[in-house]
Amino acid sequence: MLFRSLSEEVQERIEMIIHHLHYTDLQNDLIDWRDSGYHDLLFGALLVSKFQYPDLPTTPVLQDIEKIRRNVWLELNSFLTPLEQANVLSSIMYKYYNLKGVEVSYEHPDDFFIHKVLECKKGNALTNGILYQIMCDLLDINAKIINIPKQCIIAFYHSDFDTTTHIGHPQDKIHFYVDATTGKAFSHKDVENYFERLSLLPTAFHFKPQSHVKLIKVLLEEVAKCFDRPSNDYKQAELVSLANLLK
């Protein structure tokens, strides 16, 4: 019994050393991503996955993403309206590909890891939204996740909208919105009604795109909430520390 106990203790120490090495590598990779000129959203999401799955092979994920992108691209053409583009993308992702939206549950950390969302074809609003935006980025569709409270909403902007140069109210440059959980489109009036139900006055901030860095920061913060048991305190602290690297 003593021998097995000592053996288990040694094994745990070895596992913690390996985990710490992986974590240090992940810290460095995240800093490199943060400081790079272009913050690729898929790469950022894969870094979050590698916290729990450090040996994750990325090639199958990239292949899955490319299959979806190509299926959508084949259905798109320059004559489609933005709403028609959204309908094509949502139809392929949520019907043909059969992506499902699930409620946020901190009991299921896999729902926050992009490779698991692709593998199991189900994700919560945040991960489905990130996947949707990745597709829009790859297809040159000007659609971004915005700052609507308690929701993950994708705004389809006018093709000439650029958040870095636009001076007016960003809502004026939005055609419509898509619910990341289901892929369904809805109108400005629907958003106005939502703010009324919250008794909240909408501001320009709510309609600005979230940066890729901000999205990955939020994703890390959400994953951290999955590790709130005493045995996982160190993981929660590490995830919060990673999130704090992103401003």
Predicted regions and their residues:
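A structural boundary/capping signal
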Residues: 1-247
